C-alpha cells in the first residue's frame, strides 16, 4: 500500500521497518489492480478512511468500483469512480433497486451518474453524488520571471496532443516573448504500479527530454507534486479521456493555475465555469488547433490583473466546495442517515 505504511527508524540503526497501519486504513478495500497504485481513486479512498470515525467504518464496507467480496457483517456501499462501460460495473446492468446488493451507489459527478443511468439503468433511488475532495493548496507567490505550464496526469489522457502543440507554439510565438515559457511534465504509469504501460509512450517522453523548454520529471508523490504546482501558472490538459471527475484539475484550480482543457465528460462540471474550456472534437488535428488557440491565449493573458483576480476567486471557490473538511461532514451525514434508515 504505497505512501500509507509509515517507516520507523530502528534505534539500533538496523534496517527500517514498516509501522503498523492506522486502524482506519486496515479496512480499506484493495484488489489485485490497485494494490500498488496511488492515483486519484486511491487518494480519495485513503483520504476518506483517514477521516471517517472508526465506528462508522466498522458498520460500512465502502467498495471503490471493483467488487471482490462483500462482508456480510457490514452494510455494503459501492463507491463508483470508473465509467459505465467498464467491465467491473457490468453487474449493475438493469438491476432493480430491490435486487441491488448495495445500500447505496455513490458517484463522483452528476455526469457519471447520468451515464450509469443511460447505459446500465441504475436506480436513481439508490444513487447519490458525492464529489471528490482535496486538501486545499496554501496561499503562495508564483515566479514572476517565467511562465510555467504543467501537465500532471497519466500520458494517455492527452500528452500526445500537448507536446506537438507546445513545440509549435514555442517555435512560432513563445520564443519571441519577453518571459520564457516552459512546459513541465509529470506523467507515467508508475503511479498505478504499471510500468509496462509506459512503453508505448517512451518516444513521447524522449521528445520531452530532448526539448530545451520541456522538462520531463516522471512522477512525484502527491504532496511533493502539490508543492511544484505552486510554481506553475497554467495547467494544459487537452483531455481525450472521459473523466468522471479530475483530481489533477481540482488541485490545479486550488493552486491558482489558469486551466486550459477540453469540455469533455465531467470536466465542465468539475471546473464549474472557472476555466478556459474549448469545445471537444473527435478530429485529432482540429482538437490540436482548438487547444493551441486557447493555450496561446492563456499564456498571453496569465499575467494580466483581471486574470489574477479571477484565479484568486477560482481558488477560493475550489478550496471551499472541494475541501475535505466539508466533504467528510457530508459523508458522515449520509452514513448516519443510512444507519437510521436501517434501524
Name every feature range the model reports, one short phrase each.
Residues 1-70:
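N-terminal pre-catalytic "stem/leader" segment of glycosyltransferase-like enzymes
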Residues 38-43, 282, 286, 306-339:
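A charged, aromatic-enriched C-terminal amphipathic alpha-helix characteristic of glycosyltransferases
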Residues 60-89, 103-107, 128-130:
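Active-site proximal beta-strand in glycosyltransferases
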Residues 102-117, 122-139:
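Donor nucleotide-sugar binding/catalytic pocket of nucleotide-sugar-dependent glycosyltransferases
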Residues 141-158, 163-166, 184:
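Conserved donor-binding/catalytic core segment of Leloir-type glycosyltransferases
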Residues 197-223:
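Nucleotide-activated donor-binding/catalytic signature segment of Leloir-type glycosyltransferases, i.e.
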Residues 230-244, 257:
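Acidic donor-binding loop of glycosyltransferase active sites
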Amino acid at each position: 500500500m504505497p505512501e500509507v505504511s509509515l517507516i520507523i527508524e530502528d534505534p539500533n540503526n538496523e534496517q527500517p521497518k514498516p509501522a503498523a497501519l492506522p486502524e482506519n486504513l486496515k479496512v480499506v478495500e484493495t484488489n489485485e489492480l490497485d494494490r500498488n497504485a496511488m492515483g486519484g481513486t486511491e487518494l480519495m479512498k485513503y483520504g476518506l478512511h483517514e477521516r471517517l470515525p472508526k465506528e462508522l467504518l466498522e458498520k460500512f464496507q465502502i467498495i471503490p468500483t471493483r467488487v471482490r467480496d462483500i462482508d456480510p457483517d457490514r452494510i455494503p456501499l459501492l463507491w463508483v469512480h470508473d465509467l459505465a462501460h467498464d467491465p467491473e460495473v457490468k453487474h449493475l446492468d438493469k438491476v432493480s433497486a430491490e435486487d441491488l446488493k448495495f445500500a447505496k451507489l455513490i458517484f463522483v459527478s452528476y455526469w457519471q451518474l447520468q451515464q450509469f443511468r443511460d447505459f446500465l439503468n441504475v436506480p436513481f433511488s439508490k444513487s447519490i453524488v458525492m464529489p471528490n475532495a482535496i486538501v486545499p493548496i496554501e496561499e503562495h507567490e508564483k515566479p514572476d520571471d517565467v511562465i510555467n505550464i504543467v501537465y500532471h496526469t497519466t500520458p494517455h489522457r492527452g500528452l500526445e496532443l500537448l507536446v506537438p502543440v507546445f513545440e509549435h507554439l514555442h517555435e512560432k510565438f513563445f520564443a519571441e516573448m519577453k518571459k520564457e515559457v516552459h512546459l513541465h511534465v509529470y506523467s507515467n504509469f508508475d503511479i498505478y504500479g504499471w510500468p509496462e504501460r509506459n512503453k508505448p509512450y517512451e518516444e513521447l517522453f524522449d521528445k520531452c527530454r530532448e526539448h530545451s523548454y520541456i522538462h520531463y520529471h516522471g512522477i512525484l508523490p502527491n504532496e511533493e507534486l502539490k508543492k511544484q504546482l505552486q510554481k506553475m501558472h497554467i495547467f494544459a490538459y487537452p483531455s481525450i479521456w472521459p473523466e468522471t471527475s479530475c483530481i489533477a484539475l481540482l488541485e490545479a484550480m486550488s493552486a491558482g493555475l489558469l486551466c486550459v482543457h477540453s469540455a469533455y465528460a465531467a470536466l465542465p462540471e468539475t471546473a464549474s465555469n472557472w476555466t478556459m474550456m474549448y469545445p471537444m472534437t473527435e478530429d485529432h488535428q482540429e482538437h490540436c488547433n482548438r487547444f493551441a488557440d486557447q493555450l496561446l491565449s492563456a499564456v498571453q493573458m496569465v499575467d494580466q490583473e483581471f486574470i489574477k483576480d479571477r484565479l484568486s476567486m477560482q481558488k477560493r471557490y475550489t478550496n471551499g466546495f472541494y475541501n475535505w473538511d466539508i466533504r467528510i461532514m457530508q459523508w458522515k451525514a449520509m452514513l448516519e442517515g443510512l444507519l437510521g434508515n436501517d434501524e
